[in-house]
Amino acid sequence: MPLTSLAHHCYTMACNNAWSNHRLLTACGKLSQADFVATRTSFFPTIKSTLNHILTVDWYYVDALERGLSGAEPNREVDRFFDPEEPFDTCTALAVEQRAVDRRLINACAALDDAKLALPIPVMRRAGVQTEAATRLLAHLFQHQIHHRGQVHAMLAGTSVKPPQLDEFFCANEAHLRAAELAELGLSEARIWTN
């Protein structure tokens, strides 16, 4: 089934994000705690810190997106998303929260249409409120997630846990490779591709 609109593409990207996070966090969940927190070569020095960064930034932008799409004022207390900088010490606890924010992003994207994609989304920054079109905010968020998941993937290569394949989401002939994980997430090929 083809992508039918930009809104549909954003929805599929949100589903891809949830699936990729699920697959990556499942692999990271096989690490010992020592490996999870071990210092490595990357932008953030540990798998733990990188995964926490993905999560806190997701909280920040998904909150801004939900508020902007509903017409609510921007959140003035955005520091709460980053204090503490690493809210979770274990992969298990982090995975639960990541799955919850991934579901929020899927739900927000499922409600998109062309008009909502054009909406200005106010984002609270330290310097004040900045506004981004929903399309640009989503593009940035998806890119941010991919960028840092790639760093975790590379760090996993230095452990005994094999880094998972993260590019088996969009091609129809690879549906069988993701079916079980989509079911675990409450998603299906039919729902994703006929939105």
Mark where each language-model region is.
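Long amphipathic alpha-helical segments
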Residues: 114-118, 158, 185-193
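Extreme N-terminal tail/first-helix region
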Residues: 2-15, 192-193
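A short, mixed-charge helix-start or loop-turn motif at secondary-structure junctions
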Residues: 3-7, 83-91, 127, 131-135
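Charged/polar, low-hydrophobicity segments characteristic of intrinsically disordered regions
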Residues: 81-100, 174-195
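A short coil-to-beta-strand element that immediately follows conserved catalytic motifs
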Residues: 113-120, 163-165
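Short, contiguous alpha-helical
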Residues: 11-26, 30-80, 124-188
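Helix-adjacent hinge/juxtasegments
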Residues: 71-117
